[in-house]
């Protein structure tokens, strides 16, 4: 008894260390993601950027509306005639997002103002293009296609401009001075409404110019938000001891203070959702809690055979099996010889090459993302390969569906993630269990359209190839042709 208590105490201590590691890895991931957003001038998509955007829109909109209601003369009137064509709310969103996208950077004021004015012109341009009856269907079709491809502003803008020019759409481009006036006005109104940024004069090489920077107060606030939120997005691992049981709507799952108490139902950490979670405490839900606890207290082990196969094929492209993403990316198309030529033929060749290159680039980004997910799956599987038991914390979505919180490596994950899991407590299959194993083997291979009896017969007919694949998956390729290759290989090994 003493030995058992001592061993379990050590297990809990190791689990707490794992949760500290989860927290730190999540913090580094968040920091890396936000640094990339700053580099790409997409700071409005960060945690602090979203908060600034949400807090500034209403005040900024009211300030714009007040300005438009006034009878202005002079340079401001030039900007006013453009802004009158847009809803103040839309103008506020576009301008605030553009300013906040690089809020912690030091930007030359003139360049920032011209760029902001260009964003307003783009909006008016595409509104005019989409509202004409002959172009409306085309605009919607292009946008739908772009939603599947990319959310990068410059790429979307280029595709829409290209399509509008092909349709012969005409537009009087704004003079640079007008873009500057529109941008200057919106920046000054943003400063007036929010006080988040300021214009400063700096001197460099005996020259003076204005820059747009965040105020000292804003920078301090951003630092505090970053420090506070850095560790609120941990990289969830499996547990090596039983999770904390769900007894109420808050606090089940991980066992230490390193992880913030979880909500029973997933959702944004906003007032309305927190109110809903608090309200759930008033309801007696033994069936819900018992079901959750039963699932997350089910012990698993890592399937080492599948793990070793996955590690081998992942790290050696020449032995790739089972549909894993190789390290090789698609090659960009060769540039045409006249790509630098400004003639109509050269410009046409450049446009065609860009279209082809964009498709390849987008596909490569997807491949990189999938390979990274596979790498994380293998990493976590390898980390817990020698544990006698592992557990996965579970929660509910707003539809009351059960989901594990562990990223990448969990029994509800990809073909690879599922295949790397085995129940820790073994039980004999029996006659009925053998029947369902055969059905699952046939299903994962893609033989799921024939009758149940024919599926069982199919398994017995291919028994020798199934066993050969399990014994030597690198020299027997039968399992690779399955719809779910690694899951199929797992079933063969179990058989």
Locate predicted features.
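Non-catalytic nucleic-acid-binding interfaces of large nucleic-acid enzymes and RNP effectors
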Residues: 1-495
